[in-house]
């Protein structure tokens, strides 16, 4: 059977026709509509999926935010604008006529990455460091989503009580400091106004401030991993996202994690499926128990 997998992010929408062996047969991308309105998103999704839906038997969605009863929510509702409570599952079922499943994108990515690990790994955590920081937890071979879809939102654990205010309303969340947005917000002087990609480029060129910003992000993520190990006793942590997969970033996380006590050490690896993990994880979930 073929699954129409959809990844809904803050900057782009992706869709792919995925076989049961997780091979992507066809793929399309569009920018996420700048106008955060239900009509704009519905129209963009219609344009995105129309060429792919004719050969699919089901739809699987990996989306930013919290998915609750098929609708789109968020820890920070302002991020969604007019899309708060957008009926994601009913909309795709109406557009395609196919049974539809929806899950948080980091939870979906965790499920894909879990299946890429050795068979003796039953407990793992996926952390994505990108525009924000998210995560997914697999415990004893089962993906944890929680009663309300909140499970795995690791970016909203506390890193620094005196740190910057996070979009969720707390002060000093991991996301507010270690994410691409957090890195950019902390840049000053000649780097003020730079995005995270530019900060990383300056760090590679030896700019001292940029090096410190990237190091601080990696240190905060390493401390998060130590906390995750203490909380879940996971066997493996997988890192993804545009920041997490940036050149040299994982090595820095390893460096800072090695400074934590031995009990908090855990195997680290980069995401096997790279930026397709969300799409493929949603497709896997739609296939049922694996």
Swiss-Prot record:
EC class of the enzyme, as a word: transferase
Gene Ontology BP annotations: N-acetylneuraminate catabolic process
Keyword Metal-binding among record annotations: yes
The enzyme's E.C. designation: 2.7.1.60
Pfam families in UniProt: ROK (PF00480)
Subunit record text: Homodimer.
Family named by the database record: Belongs to the ROK (NagC/XylR) family. NanK subfamily.
Protein name: N-acetylmannosamine kinase
Organism, as annotated: Citrobacter koseri (strain ATCC BAA-895 / CDC 4225-83 / SGSC4696)
């Amino acid at each position: 059977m073929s699954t129409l997998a959809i990844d809904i992010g803050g900057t782009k929408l992706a869709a792919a026709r995925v076989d049961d062996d997780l091979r992507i047969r066809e793929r399309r991308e569009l920018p996420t509509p700048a106008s955060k309105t239900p009509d704009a998103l519905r129209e963009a999704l219609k344009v995105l999926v129309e060429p792919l839906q004719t050969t699919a038997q089901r739809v699987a969605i990996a989306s930013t935010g919290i998915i609750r009863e098929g609708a789109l929510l968020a820890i920070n509702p302002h991020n969604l604008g007019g899309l708060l409570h957008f009926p994601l599952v009913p909309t795709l079922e109406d557009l395609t006529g196919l049974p539809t499943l929806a899950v948080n994108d980091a939870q979906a990515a965790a499920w894909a990455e879990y299946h890429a690990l050795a068979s003796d790994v039953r407990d793992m955590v996926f952390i994505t460091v990108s525009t924000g920081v998210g995560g997914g937890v697999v415990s004893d071979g089962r993906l944890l989503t929680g009663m309300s879809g909140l499970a795995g939102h690791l970016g909203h654990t506390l890193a620094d009580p005196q740190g910057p205010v996070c979009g969720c309303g707390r002060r000093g969340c991991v996301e507010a400091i270690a994410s691409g947005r957090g890195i950019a917000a902390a840049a000053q002087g000649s780097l003020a106004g730079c995005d995270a990609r530019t900060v990383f480029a300056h760090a590679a060129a030896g700019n001292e401030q940029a090096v410190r910003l990237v190091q601080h992000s990696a240190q905060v993520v390493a401390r998060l991993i130590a906390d995750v190990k203490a909380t879940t006793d996971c066997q493996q942590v997988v890192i993804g996202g545009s920041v997490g997969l940036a050149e040299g970033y994982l090595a820095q996380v390893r460096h800072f994690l090695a400074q934590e006590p031995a009990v908090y050490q855990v195997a680290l690896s980069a995401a096997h499926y790279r930026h397709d993990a969300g799409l493929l994880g949603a497709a896997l979930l739609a296939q049922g128990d694996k």
